[in-house]
């Protein structure tokens, strides 16, 4: 398909501006407003907060059991990193380090809990989307389970839940190409963003690199993904969900718009360092 050019201009009249000098670094952050504070949660178990978006205070940073937001994951490391994300995982990290990336936090109005969706990742296409819950925005977030797997082959697919939703014939025909994962057509399970639509339904958009961006509905009562019925004509996969054309999301005039994660308009959200 072709591309469309838009004349997109923003007026800064009436908008307060200033320099951010607090030197808090949070990579791949999501932003949450709760209890009068703005929170950012990012890769490498980092988090910060601010009351005015200018002055930031570090809440957590670094891979450690003492991390007040993410540290509980080490208590269940055998489960949380079973597939990917550590040197002891089924698919080991390529640098033998722990990798927890790109969290997104949302308040679940049905359960009354804060949900953190994030990925553990080992290689450029072997990742696992997981989630945790907390009663407060600052955590600690208790690991609840794994949601979506990518990067497997015939030997490692047994370490995933893929065959709970599709049969072997479908999995081998679609998800595995030759001796490796079919990364050309299916996603790397990273970079989740969770949101409510105008009808109050909960969704997760995810994926990067590899085969594109996908969308799955979330069960509001559990926080788990809902695997849909296959619908090839509409690009709906029974495991990975609806294939989208582009990436991360924002709300514009009561519509959910999908924008490329690298787009200039959302670089400030997806790739900023404060």
Language model features by range: what are they?
Residues 1-274:
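Carbohydrate-active catalytic/glycan-binding domains of CAZyme proteins
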């Amino acid at each position: 398909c072709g591309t469309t050019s838009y004349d997109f201009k923003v007026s800064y009249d009436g908008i307060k501006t200033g320099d951010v000098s607090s030197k808090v670094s949070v990579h791949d952050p999501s932003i949450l407003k709760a209890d009068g504070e703005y929170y950012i949660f990012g890769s490498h178990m980092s988090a910060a907060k601010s009351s005015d978006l200018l002055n930031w205070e570090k809440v957590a940073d670094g891979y450690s059991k003492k991390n007040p937001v993410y540290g509980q994951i080490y208590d269940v490391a055998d489960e949380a990193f079973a597939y990917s994300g550590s040197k002891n995982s089924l698919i080991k990290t390529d640098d033998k380090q722990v990798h927890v990336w790109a969290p997104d936090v949302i308040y679940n109005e049905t359960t009354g809990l804060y949900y953190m969706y994030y990925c553990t990742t080992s290689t450029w296409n072997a990742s696992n989307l997981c989630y945790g819950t907390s009663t407060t925005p600052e955590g600690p977030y208790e690991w609840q389970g794994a949601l979506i797997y990518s990067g497997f082959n015939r030997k490692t697919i047994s370490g995933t839940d893929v065959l709970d939703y599709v049969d072997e014939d479908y999995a081998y025909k679609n998800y595995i190409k030759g001796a490796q994962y079919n990364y050309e057509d299916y996603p790397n399970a990273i970079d989740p963003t969770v949101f409510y639509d105008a009808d109050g339904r909960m969704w997760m958009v995810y994926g990067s690199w590899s085969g594109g961006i996908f969308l799955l509905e979330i069960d509001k009562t559990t926080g788990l993904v809902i695997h849909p019925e296959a619908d090839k004509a509409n690009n709906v996969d029974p495991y990975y969900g609806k294939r989208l054309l582009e990436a991360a999301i924002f709300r514009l005039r009561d519509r959910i718009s999908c924008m490329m994660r690298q787009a200039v308009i959302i670089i400030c959200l997806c790739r900023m360092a404060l």
